[in-house]
Amino acid sequence: MCRADWSTSLSRSAAIILALLIAGCGFQMQGALRTPPEMARTFIDVDDRNSLFARELHAQLQRADVDIVDTATAATARLSITYEETDQRVLSVSARNVPTEYEVYYTIQYAIDAGERRILESQTLTVTRNYTYDSTLVLGKAREEELLRDAIVEDLVRIVLKQIATL
């Protein structure tokens, strides 16, 4: 009986110490996205509403209970995506001058206005991922590039949402 109490006490002490260490280093559980009240009704101003980034941003803002409106006049805030580019570039080539490694990148530039007031100055974000290329696995590598691009977009949206949460 005494042995069980000692084991339980040791487990509780270890759990408390671990919780204090985690809290002490600044770790916080990620909660729901907090958006400023000005973004209650947001218009997303983007050239291509069907781009990967625009679709993912739209979906994530809706999940955060932001009402995405179709016109700027109905909005309390305007999230302007002024630049969006995605592509890939060769990172390395073989001795036969055949690409062996690529970098996939996605760059966006955006700002947020609430009425006449800019609440987030223009920001430029670029996220990149590398992958090796094997000409014998063309179909698999095309799918890998697609998955990397999807992951990059998710990362970009996550960064934008974190910046919005700090407003």
Over which residues does each language-model region extend?
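N-terminal segment of the mature soluble domain
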Residues: 37-85
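Surface-exposed short loop/turn segments
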Residues: 74, 80-124, 130-143
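Solvent-exposed, acidic/flexible segments
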Residues: 50, 54, 101-105, 145-154
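C-terminal motif of bacterial Sec signal peptides marking the signal peptidase cleavage site
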Residues: 21-24
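Bacterial signal peptide processing site
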Residues: 26-29
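C-terminal/domain-edge helix-coil "capping" segments
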Residues: 139-167
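Bacterial N-terminal signal peptides that target proteins for export
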Residues: 1-14
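Sec/Tat-exported extracytoplasmic proteins
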Residues: 61-65, 112-116, 135, 159-167
